[in-house]
Amino acid sequence: MPPRKKEYGIKRASGSLVHFRAPVSATTIRRHSAVVPSVLTFAVIVASGGLLLMIEKGMLNSVQTPPPRANGRKVEYRLRSSSDTAADVESQIVQEIRNRTIRSVCGQRNMPHSVWSLSPLQRKTLLQHILVNDEHRFLYCYVPKVACSNWKRVLKVLSGALANVDIKVKMDHRADLVFLSDLPPEEIRHRLRHYFKFMFVREPMARLLSAYRNKFGEIEAYQRKYGAEIIRRYRKGYAKDKKISGNDVTFTEFTRYLVDEDPERMNEHWMPIYNLCQPCAIEYDFIGSYERLESDASYILERVGAPQHVRFPERQTWYKPVTKETLHYYLCTVPQKFLKELLPKYILDFSLFGYPLPNTTTEYCRH
């Protein structure tokens, strides 16, 4: 057996290692100073932009990538072409940016530093969104509208509940899945300390638009429960005694509803990612992104030692992507005053995960 290769990453204050896929020289990335979250937002965007520009220029393409380790088990690694190297390095840089940013923001005195320092409501929400796989020793915090249904399929295949990810069955989002909230405190502590922990993020406004189009355009239960209430609250001139189906909520009405909602009590499909997964309270080993879903998911499957035949599902043919043009169109239909009230509710999702704030100026929206 060849000697085990060195692991790469940065050590947290607790001594644990944040894993990356390849080494990068110290001159590649500069340290960011810790500042309060409101100021950090813009500093992160500027710093991230410079690093990603370096990636686009191909400055790091020659760095070699070691195979990920998988909890000490032998893994039949998927074959990787040489063209994957640049993508691996780019992903590593994105991880480095996110980890430095998270450490800066989460180092503030008023931020939670463990699961047990959260309020009962915050802890309940978090533990109900973390899925457990004991065989491969990992925890996955799922975020609705960030490919979580496909990840649940993968977990069911790994546990033997499904033969493969392509089986055409209606997804039951609770059956055959183990949630961290199902376990007693001592077992929760053990898994948080010893298991590989990951989550996936998405551009916050694209995630909201995806939820809006899906839930209010296709799901009758959401139209009745939320759509009808939104119309009663925010639509001018509607007759109070008129029966409302809730299937024609506008995106502006939806944003007004979000502005008035408490982020900690929102429906999970539009609750901020920060509130769902609490990245300050849990030290995630890997934070993947929807924008790099295929490569990041492939890395996770290798990292946890998934069998060769287990793969991440392809997107369904009926899937309607949120393109930049589509997002631009919808955001520009919302009055500026509502967006200015909405964005602060998701400011930690933008700043922690390195997403720039959307440009919705009048000049930009003319195009």
UniProtKB/Swiss-Prot annotation:
Key words, A-Z: Carbohydrate metabolism, Glycoprotein, Golgi apparatus, Membrane, Signal-anchor, Transferase, Transmembrane, Transmembrane helix
Organism, scientific name: Danio rerio (Zebrafish)
GO MF term set: dermatan 4-sulfotransferase activity; sulfotransferase activity
Cytoplasmic compartment residues: 1-34
Stated name of the protein: Carbohydrate sulfotransferase 14
Entry binding sites for 3'-phosphoadenylyl sulfate: 144-150, 202-210
Function comment: Catalyzes the transfer of sulfate to position 4 of the N-acetylgalactosamine (GalNAc) residue of dermatan sulfate.
GO biological process, alphabetically ordered: carbohydrate biosynthetic process; dermatan sulfate proteoglycan metabolic process
EC number: 2.8.2.-
Similarity remark: Belongs to the sulfotransferase 2 family.
Recorded GO CC terms: Golgi membrane
Entry keyword annotation includes rRNA-binding: no
Transmembrane segments: 35-55
Main location (coarse class): Golgi
Residues bearing carbohydrate: 99, 359
Ranges of the Lumenal topological domain: 56-367
Lineage, top ranks: Eukaryota, Metazoa, Chordata, Craniata, Vertebrata
